[in-house]
Amino acid sequence: MFTDELQIPYVVTKNKDEKDNYNRISPTFTHTDHQFRLTQIIRQEVGNPLLELFGIIRSDLINGTQNFYQYIINHREEVNTAGEGFTILNKFDFRNKVIEMFSSDNFSRNLNYVRLIAFTNDCIGFWNTFIRDGVLNNPQGMITKDDMFTAYRTVFDEYKSPIIINSEDYIVHDVRYYIADNGLACYCITLRSAFDGKVTPMFKIIDFWDSTNMNNFGTMINAIHYKALTGTERSRWYRYFRFKDIHLTMTDFRLNSANKNRLVAKDIDYGYGITCHKSQGSTFENVCIDLDDIIYFQTKWGKRIRRNPAEALRLLYVAMSRATKHAYLKL
């Protein structure tokens, strides 16, 4: 098992009787003959002030203390002569830093130059829209050439070959608007992998900006899922998953009550901002972290509440340790 036990477990077991299961690791990883534990950060060079922050976070997690928050209140910025380190920014200055980083030539030449990281999907949705439409000026359509995407699951073609791979980054290579035979409005696109430059086969993404189109999509997927749920044919689930693999979505979709209100998770999304969980395993030169979104959450009544301290520190540890050079935090 290769893992850092102070970060977010890759796989957790679900127990409906327990409220806090974010740190309950699957027995798949704990009941093994050989285990390897990561205890040293290896992304940053010696002398990077980030390393001291990581040490404080690790100590807090081990000892149940909260020294990290006091430290960043007293040390708003620590940067070495190479420009490596961390900076705590207010809301206005953080926004300007995001604009500066994502509009720079460094980002256009190197997609791993910077990434924005937060905890909730809503926050990531806000920042993806802000960066794409406000910074990069791509508001003319839902998908345009050179848009950046991150895959949220691996999708296969009918021959079991992967079209897109979970967590990989892509750039839109070609795009055209298309009305499918079933009447659904889609974007037919090919993507260029940011990893190896290979171009994917063409595939379809549902136009979710069109509410009528999404209603039609909902009617279809609910009907197909209900047949799979209640039917007896051996191929019923194959037809459902084949429909999903042909019609990809950029937004989560909730099935109706007849289908037990199950959530159909999105397949792909803009990749300028990603969640802490999605970032795990990735490496970027710089990260912009919405620390407010990690420390606090909002109840359905609109009340702002502190997140579980240990959970927040684990999320923050993952987000900050993605950077090889500099972390900018909004607080």
Task: For each feature predicted by the language model, list its residue ranges.
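Structural recognition of the conserved hydrophobic beta-strand(s) that form the central parallel beta-sheet
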Residues: 1-4, 37-38, 329
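Short beta-strand/turn micro-motifs composed of small residues
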Residues: 3-4, 118, 291, 331
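Conserved helicase motor core of P-loop NTPases
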Residues: 6-166, 173-227
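C-terminal accessory regions
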Residues: 185-331
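Hydrophobic beta-strand signal
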Residues: 150, 171, 285-288
